[in-house]
Amino acid sequence: MNRTRFIQGLNSNIELSDKERRRAIRNSINKRPWKLNCTIAMEEFAELTQQVSKQIRGYGDRIGLIEEMVDAYICLKLLESIFNISPEDMQKAIDVKMDRERKR
């Protein structure tokens, strides 16, 4: 996304409902073959990796990091839908991992 447009969006009052968010995910899945969506997800995860690396080295910026985190988050939602993973299954798996993290 164009950086200026992203910043303008952050400063706007846009707030999608859960239904609108789910519809956007469905539209993305219906527009492109599932393998292409998976490839896009991998690319977005790589961009997040690069942005985190920049943060570690002191060259990153907060807006860039947020944008890549959100892209990766959206891609996770796409993958959940593509691979038919229910919100309940995701939450249970998150709880298992968080419990392990909590005990460290």
Each language-model region and where it sits:
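Flexible "arm" and connector segments at domain edges
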Residues: N2-M69, Y73-R104
